[in-house]
Structure formats: C-alpha cells, structure tokens
Amino acid sequence: MTSRRWFHPNITGVEAENLLLTRGVDGSFLARPSKSNPGDFTLSVRRNGAVTHIKIQNTGDYYDLYGGEKFATLAELVQYYMEHHGQLKEKNGDVIELKYPLNCADPTSERWFHGHLSGKEAEKLLTEKGKHGSFLVRESQSHPGDFVLSVRTGDDKGESNDGKSKVTHVMIRCQELKYDVGGGERFDSLTDLVEHYKKNPMVETLGTVLQLKQPLNTTRINAAEIESRVRELSKLAETTDKVKQGFWEEFETLQQQECKLLYSRKEGQRQENKNKNRYKNILPFDHTRVVLHDGDPNEPVSDYINANIIMPEFETKCNNSKPKKSYIATQGCLQNTVNDFWRMVFQENSRVIVMTTKEVERGKSKCVKYWPDEYALKEYGVMRVRNVKESAAHDYTLRELKLSKVGQGNTERTVWQYHFRTWPDHGVPSDPGGVLDFLEEVHHKQESIVDAGPVVVHCSAGIGRTGTFIVIDILIDIIREKGVDCDIDVPKTIQMVRSQRSGMVQTEAQYRFIYMAVQHYIETLQRRIEEEQKSKRKGHEYTNIKYSLVDQTSGDQSPLPPCTPTPPCAEMREDSARVYENVGLMQQQRSFR
C-alpha cells in the first residue's frame, strides 16, 4: 500500500460521514480513532450514498473486527480488506468494499513529509538517494496518529563508525495537536519541530549527533492539497548559490533518471525507416511501438510508424489488466507517412485524434495536412477519408471524419479530430483553462464511443506537447475515478509514460504547466462542490438526523467527480447505537478477485 493517510486522527463519526458524503464517492473509506472505546478504531465506508461504520478492536496484541482475521497493524488490516473483495460483509450478506482511501490532509505541505512509509522503505530511500544529514518525516506504522523522523547518519557513503549504513528513527508524538519527541519542548506543527531541531541537533544516547542538514523530498501529493505543493515549488531559492529549487529541481531530478530508460529503438534506426522519422533521433521504443499488420509481406519495413502505445497502468499489462483508456503518442505526419497514419488509426480502431500543433509554426512545417478539406473525400493509399463537417470552438477545431478501407464499403467508421490551435509557438499557455476544457470534450467523446481504441495524440515530434496533454489527462482521470483526496505523483506519472515513449514532457515550462492544470481542475471542482452544497441547503429543510441517500446525478455529463450533499454538521449528533451497522464475521474464501 502506497499511502496510509486514510487514517484521520482527529475526527468524529459525524465529521467522517460529512467528509465521505461531500468529498468521497461510493467505495471511499477512512479510519479514525474510536470515541466510544479509546484505543480502538473505526472504519467508515461510503456505500450507496450512505456511510457504514465498522468497529476495529485493538487488543494490544493484534487488530481485528471483533472476530475474523487478526493483523499486526491497522495498515495490514485495511490493506487485506482492500485487496480481498468479498471478505468483508454485513450479516445480511451484502459486501462492503474498500475501494478508494479518503486521505487525511497532510499535517504539513513541506516536501520532506512522505506520509505512509515503512522504516525499511525510509532506510532504503535515505541510503540510496540521501547523504549524511539527509532526513524525512513519515507516519508511524506502530502508533497511528504519530510520526517518525528518519535521519541518515555516518559519512557520505552512508556508513557509521562500524562500516555499516546507519539511519536513525526518532518517534514524534502528536498529543492534543502538539508535537514532541518524547520530552522537552512541544511544538504547534511538524514544521516548527523540524526547524527547531535543524538549529538545535538532537544527540543519541550513544553520543551520535542527529544533524538535519538537507531534506529528502517526496513528489507524492494529495490532489486536494496541490495548491500548497505548487506554493512550495514556486518558492525562490533561499540563497543565490542554491540553484536547485522547486520546479526546476524536481524536473532536473526527473531528467537524470533518463539513463534508466535506454530501451532499444532498432526499428526506427533501420536505414529503410529513416525517412519516416521527422527527427532522426526521436524514435519509438521497440517494445511499445505500434506495429502495422496490413502491409506488403514482401516489404518487412511496411509495419513501421513512429508511434508508441501509452498505457496509463503500464505495470499491470503483464497481469493482463487492460486500462480503461490508452493512448497512441506519435509524431506529426510527413508527406510520406500519411498513408501509414491512417492505416494505424484504422487498425487500432482509434476514434479520437488530438492534434496539438499548427501545420506550420515560425515558418517551419510541424505536420502536413493529413485530412481532406471540408465536405471533400480523399484516398490515402488503401484508406479513404471523407470530411463530413468542421466546427470551430474558441481554442480548437473539431472535424468529423469518415474513415474506411478502399473497396470495403462496410468498414466505414467515424473518427473525430480535435485540433487544438492556441498553444503558443513559444512556451506554454498562460491559462490552463482552455486546455482543460479541450481535454474535457475529448474525454466525453472517447467515453461515448463503445469499444473505442486508443486516443491518438500528436504534435510535431510527438513527445513535448503530446506528453504534456497525455500526462494531464491521466492525472485528471485518476481524480475523476478516486475523488479529490487521492494521491497523485507528477514525476512518477511522467516517468511511467517515458518508459513507453522516450522524452515525453520536454521542458520545465511544460512540467510546471502540468501542475498548474491539475491545480486549476481541483479548484474548479472544489468550487463546484461548495456551490452544490449551498444550493442543496437552500432548497431543503432537514427535520431529522438521517443522512440523504440520494446521489447527486444529472442527465448531462459532468466533468467532475460525483458528490452527495449532507446536512450541516451542527444538526447531527454522534450516537453509537445509531452510527454502527451490524457487520457479520468474514467468511473464509479460497479465491480472491
């Protein structure tokens, strides 16, 4: 499990319901301390627009649900029921599914806070990426609600006097919203505590001085808190000699990992294929390239096009798990590759094309026109394309195209080309709103077509703007599915798409733009939720303490995750006799989904 921030240390049952109903979706859950039984915990799960609360017993030896499986830690219990669907049931047999953790706000926006990280994982990180004095703060696994300061000591080789790598862990207690290390001064925040011990180093009992010299930063963030992360990344360097800072530092770190992605590109390097590449050194990886199957068997290179399949959940491909949406990242067409482009679109059953460049920019050809004029029909090798109509929006042109194979009349299908026209020749757009509106239209079109193949995305080289659009779309899809409190990781997502096509997201400006676009999306979503809550409260007068079981749905497609209104918290009371639903003991099963 990558995060244990589903644990909310300071909320009541009423507050848990309010959070789950306003910020979660069905399947969202959180854990919290039990108010009625101090030392125990409660699992709160949103189901069918309502919230079920499940008691978790902490005997001092193990955690369980007052019966059933026993676990050493709260995290292991939650992970087990997340992974083993069908094990957690009510007495009437209804399954309770833990799908989406509703994360607690991080106690700090500082990048040295890593959230859920085990001691071993912290040691591995500090040993591999840190140096003497590197530190991070993480959640305590053994004491939910507390934290741990992990510090690398020894020399820069990570070795202490006995020649072994050394990482020291210091427990940070959180009591009554104050933080301390088990004695001495108490602090109002984790940041205050860390800043204090940076200036006043702690000393271990054996005399080792714990110097907090430089933080080992994380790139994972809670999507809802992206504004705080952007603010941190936008800070200017403290001193003129400290060049690496914020966005530049993160992007440069990402660039340094390119050496890990040196996969073969032999097909693109073949002499016969060189004239099919717009740029001689921007070539597709062999392991993810689109292979054209309908070429001339006497011409082995007829299967080549400079394009790669991009799967958002690439690591699951080996498990035969098909992601909901995939992409084809490709270069802008050359005159001699237009026929191959349409062969690819037809073969992959792609119904949506995203073009992010003009045909000519700054006097240079970026992509030849690969579609006919409006109302015209044109043949491209074995493919026929008819331009049914064109319509212009503020930032883009939408073309409805009919694609078929020459001589095969029953093969005609509709392909929609979204041509984004307002990306500036230099840099990135000043306002991400236009890009987000554009991607929203693309998303709805793709969703509306049954069994549509990958979305084809191209610019000129097929890596810069193409990578930027794809990464933004992937991150927004995650938020759509899991809600605003999910974890996202921009560098990790870029690294994932780069493992499938080299060089995706080319500049620091594009990297920063991804953050700005996601921030803009989140802010729009949060305003929408606030307005819906206000509207519901004005339109309804609540006369009892029951919660609304009606999901907020509408006939039109919403670009934002669903949310369910709830009465003001002041009108509710926590009553253990009412709050807790009966949950039957788990039935032992052999097969898991």
Curated annotation (Swiss-Prot):
Residue ranges of every copy of the Tyrosine-protein phosphatase domain listed in the record: 247-521
Catalyses: O-phospho-L-tyrosyl-[protein] + H2O = L-tyrosyl-[protein] + phosphate
Q: Give the modified residues of type Phosphotyrosine.
A: 62, 66, 542, 580
Gene ablation phenotype (knockout) = Conditional deletion in limb and head mesenchyme leads to increased cartilage mass and deficient ossification: osteochondroprogenitors become chondrocytes and not osteoblasts caused by inability of PTPN11/SHP2 to mediate tyrosine dephosphorylation of SOX9.
Set out the biological process GO terms recorded for this chain's protein.
atrioventricular canal development; axonogenesis; Bergmann glial cell differentiation; cellular response to epidermal growth factor stimulus; cellular response to mechanical stimulus; cerebellar cortex formation; DNA damage checkpoint signaling; ephrin receptor signaling pathway
| Localization, UniProt | Cytoplasm
Q: Name one GO molecular function term.
A: insulin receptor binding
Supply the enzyme class, top level.
hydrolase
Residue limits of the SH2 domain?
Answer: 6-102, 112-216
Q: Does the keyword DNA repair belong to this entry?
A: no
Active-site residue numbers: 459 (phosphocysteine intermediate)
Query: Matching SMART domains, A to Z?
Result: PTPc, PTPc_motif, SH2
Cite the InterPro entries for this sequence.
Prot-tyrosine_phosphatase-like, PTP_cat, SH2, SH2_dom_sf, Tyr_Pase_AS, Tyr_Pase_cat, Tyr_Pase_dom, Tyr_Pase_non-rcpt_typ-6/11
Entry EC number(s): 3.1.3.48
Posttranslational modification: Phosphorylated on Tyr-542 and Tyr-580 upon receptor protein tyrosine kinase activation; which creates a binding site for GRB2 and other SH2-containing proteins. Phosphorylated upon activation of the receptor-type kinase FLT3. Phosphorylated by activated PDGFRB. Phosphorylated upon activation of the receptor-type kinase PDGFRA.
List the expressing tissues: Highly expressed in brain, heart and kidney.
Subunit structure of this entry? Answer: Interacts with CD84 and with phosphorylated SIT1 and MZPL1. Interacts with FCRL4, FCRL6 and ANKHD1. Interacts with GAREM1 (tyrosine phosphorylated); the interaction increases MAPK/ERK activity and does not affect the GRB2/SOS complex formation. Interacts with PTPNS1 and BCAR3. Interacts with phosphorylated LIME1. Interacts with SHB and INPP5D/SHIP1. Interacts with KIR2DL1; the interaction is enhanced by ARRB2. Interacts with GAB2. Interacts with TERT; the interaction retains TERT in the nucleus. Interacts with PECAM1 and FER.
Role this protein plays: Acts downstream of various receptor and cytoplasmic protein tyrosine kinases to participate in the signal transduction from the cell surface to the nucleus. Positively regulates MAPK signal transduction pathway. Dephosphorylates GAB1, ARHGAP35 and EGFR. Dephosphorylates ROCK2 at 'Tyr-722' resulting in stimulation of its RhoA binding activity. Dephosphorylates CDC73. Dephosphorylates SOX9 on tyrosine residues, leading to inactivate SOX9 and promote ossification. Dephosphorylates tyrosine-phosphorylated NEDD9/CAS-L.
The written remark on domains in the entry is: The SH2 domains repress phosphatase activity. Binding of these domains to phosphotyrosine-containing proteins relieves this auto-inhibition, possibly by inducing a conformational change in the enzyme.
* Family note: Belongs to the protein-tyrosine phosphatase family. Non-receptor class 2 subfamily.
Q: Under what name is this protein listed?
A: Tyrosine-protein phosphatase non-receptor type 11
